[in-house]
Each structure stands twice: as structure tokens, then as C-alpha cells.
Amino acid sequence: MKVAVLGAAGGIGQALALLLKTQLPAGSKLSLYDIAPVTPGVAVDLSHIPTAVEIKGFAGEDPTPALVDADVVLISAGVARKPGMDRSDLFNINAGIVRNLMEKVAATCPKALVGIITNPVNTTVAIAAEVMKKAGVYDKNRLFGVTTLDVIRSETFIAELKGLNVADVNINVIGGHSGVTILPLLSQVKGVSFTDEEVAALTKRIQNAGTEVVEAKAGGGSATLSMGQAACRFGLSLVRGLQGEANVVECAYVDGGSEHAQFFAQPILLGKNGVEKVMPYGEVSAFEANARDAMLDTLNADIKLGVEFVK
């Protein structure tokens, strides 16, 4: 099993690489790429950790050597949010980065499962899909927008609010991966009830949690460590699916035939071909139905921006 991380010298990429080095199955290969010259050194640093995961780092303009024979590709390359920016401000820089990297993925490892972390995910996943279509290698079951950070934040905040063991909290987060498009289905959380006020406040906190971190870091960065953990969880789930493990389910932003938008985050069953099945996200409350319907204009505009960027 070979996993490639593109953008591996950044804040998310280094955290993700560390977690993968310690948690990938024995015998796996981990390949790190970044344009920054420090990247081979990041790999050397991580290579001193005693786990049975072989690691190599590549720098420079061309990610191709890192991508050869990759089974899973996780893309975190791009610029991070600064105070006052929202995820869409990142579009101008990150759109081109994702397009260029995906052209190399299409040419080198078109059958790999690709997880897009680079924001704005609502748009960058659409860009990735269009690049793969242009190359004639698009498989909607092998492309994912990584929305796991919204899930782990929801789990954490619910457990804190209700005094629960966080390991017992399971929640679906649907829609997209920015602002109002992030919709935690709080009504479905088992064994707990929320007041209307709690639902409104918790939903807003989950939607704005990225900004909470950006402001707390006072210009010194964005959510890199929690995102690294979220990306590792999702990447390991992709690997477990590829290895034939049963019942591996994660929420992700996929081209899954949703009635709501071309790309939509909801629970998916993972397997040897990536998406084995898009799962129904279940019954929702009136609050959630309204929030879902209200987000669709924003979500569809984000998707359209990505499609048009490639055309």
C-alpha cells in the first residue's frame, strides 16, 4: 500500500505525514512531495521513527516521482487562511495548485484514491474532477473532498457540551466544507437531546470553527494539527477499504448522485474501488432541512466556479 502526501512540508502536510508514519499498516510506503526544498529532510526526520513504514521525500516542480504506483493520494498543498480571509479568498491561489497537481495524478496514478484537503474544498474537488475528465480518466468513486474535520469537531463539541465520552459520539455532517454549507445532523445523535438554542449555537460553532482557530493563532496560521488528524483518519479509512475491511463508513464530499448538488458530503461506504456505496443520510429535523435547502445556492455556485476554472 503506497500513500502519497502532496503539500507535505506545510502545516497540515507535516502533521499528516507524522500521523501516517506512526499509524499506516506495517509494510506500507509513504511518499512526501512539496515544492519546498525542505521536503526530503522532512522524510529523513520522520524516517527515524521506528515503524515499519518506508518513507521518501521529493521536492521541486514535479510531483511525478512521488506519485508512481500510489494507491492513495492526499492533497494538502496550497496557502493557508489568514485572519480576515474566508475559504473562498484562497481560491485565487489554490485553484491553480490543485489543477496542476491533478494533471500529474491523472498522468501518473489515475486509479489512485484521491483525497482533496486544499481549501476551498467545495470548489477544488470540482476542479479535480474536471481535470480528470479532460484526461479521460475520471472515476467519481475515486475522488473525495475531505470533510472529516467537520465531523471530528462536531464529535468534540457535542461531547464537551453534554459531558459525554467523545468515543461514543457518532454524527453525520452533510453538505459542503465551508460556512453555511457545513451541516451537522445533530437531531440524529443517539442518546442525547438538544434545545433549539443549543442546536443553533452548536451548528454555528461547528461552521465557524476554522475561523475560531485562525483568530486564536493571531495571524500565525490556521487549523493544521486538527486537520492533520482528520486527514489521517480519512486516509486510513481509504486504506482499510482498499484492504477489503467491511463496514468502513466516513462522511466525504463526493460526486455521488445527490439530489441536492453534483458534489455533496454525506456518509459513504468505502471499499476496494473507493466509494462502494453512497449511504442515505437519514431523517432530518425541520431546522436541518431548512439549513440544507438554504445552503444549496452557495454550494452550487462554489461547484460552478471550479468547473468553469478548468474550462
Curated annotation (Swiss-Prot):
Broad enzyme group: oxidoreductase
Name of this chain's protein: Malate dehydrogenase
Example GO molecular function: L-malate dehydrogenase (NAD+) activity
Function: Catalyzes the reversible oxidation of malate to oxaloacetate.
Similarity comment: Belongs to the LDH/MDH superfamily. MDH type 1 family.
Record's catalysed reaction(s): (S)-malate + NAD(+) = oxaloacetate + NADH + H(+)
Organism annotation: Shewanella denitrificans (strain OS217 / ATCC BAA-1090 / DSM 15013)
Gene, per the UniProt record: mdh
Keywords associated with the record: NAD, Oxidoreductase, Tricarboxylic acid cycle
Quaternary context: Homodimer.
Top-level division of the source organism's lineage: Bacteria
Pfam families: Ldh_1_C, Ldh_1_N
Binding site residues for NAD(+): G7, A8, A9, G10, G11, I12, G13, D34, N94, I117, T118, N119, M227
Catalytic residues (UniProt): H177
Binding site for substrate: R81, R87, N119, R153
GO biological process: malate metabolic process; tricarboxylic acid cycle
